[in-house]
Design a protein with these regions (language model features):
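Basic, helix-initiating cap at the start of DNA-binding domains
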Residues: 1-37, 44-50, 67
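An amphipathic alpha-helix adjacent to DNA-recognition modules
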Residues: 20-28, 40-41, 52, 60-85, ...
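Amphipathic alpha-helical interaction segments
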Residues: 25, 67, 96, 100, ...
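Short amphipathic alpha-helical elements of helix-turn-helix/winged-helix folds
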Residues: 29-33, 108, 167
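Short, charged helix-capping/linker segments at alpha-helix termini
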Residues: 40-41, 153-156
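Key DNA-contact positions within bacterial/archaeal DNA-binding proteins
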Residues: 56
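Amphipathic alpha-helical packing segments from all-alpha helical-bundle domains
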Residues: 78-81, 107-111, 127-152, 159-166, ...
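Amphipathic alpha-helical segments used for helix-helix packing
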Residues: 106-128, 173-181
Length: 202
């Protein structure tokens, strides 16, 4: 018998490609790993292997686990706001568009609840992550203002936008993790109240 036949079959490694593609694969794999295992449940070597690369490849693109986590969160924000922008362009009255926005936010937070839990932990404990998170929040204020301007809606104060975003984000996290249901709250009623809040903001 050929000795090589007894060796475990190795997973095919991804072909060498452009650095941008390698980085994209690393970030995509890291997003799934952070979401599944949590920030503390993995390390840079495991993240590299999850993308199909050797650990050395990871360090060509990221200094450490924290840096790739920040890249993951930045892309998470991009995806969420792309969906919000598309929902605002969708035909329908303000309440219908608001319902669409609330539903996509709830689904997005539910899909990535593990990643969100790690984000909350790190923003409380790590000043670098906290500053990055606040930078993303400032960017969200600008994105919201631009979306309103593009739709021809009147501008609102940053304080009004902050209250809206804080409310949506915290409620979406609570509902994604079944916190509201555990407290005996009606999820449908919570959704309806969020739709009212978003409708008033459009």
């Amino acid at each position: 018998m050929n000795p090589s036949a007894r060796r475990p079959k190795e997973e095919p490694r991804p072909r060498r490609g452009a650095p941008e593609e390698t980085r994209r694969r690393l970030v995509a794999a890291a997003a799934e790993e952070f979401n599944r295992l949590g920030y503390e449940g993995t390390d840079s070597n495991r993240l590299a292997r999850a993308a199909g690369y050797a650990p050395g490849t990871f360090y060509k693109h990221f200094r450490d686990k924290r840096e790739i986590f920040l890249a993951v969160y930045g892309e998470w924000v991009d995806r969420e706001w792309e969906e919000v922008s598309a929902a605002l362009e969708w035909a329908g009255d303000a309440a219908q568009r608001a319902g669409r926005i609330v539903d996509l936010l709830l689904a997005h937070h539910r899909r990535w609840s593990g990643l969100r839990a790690s984000l909350r932990m790190l923003t409380a404990a790590d000043p670098v992550v906290r500053e990055f998170y606040r930078g993303q929040r400032r960017r969200q204020f600008e994105l919201l203002a631009r979306l309103r301007a593009a739709a021809g809606d009147p501008p609102r104060s940053r304080e009004q936008d902050a209250l809206l975003l804080f409310t949506l984000e915290r409620c979406a996290d609570a509902m994604a993790e079944d916190e509201a249901q555990t407290l005996g709250l009606d999820a449908a009623a919570m959704r309806a109240l969020l739709v009212e809040r978003v409708t008033a903001a459009l």
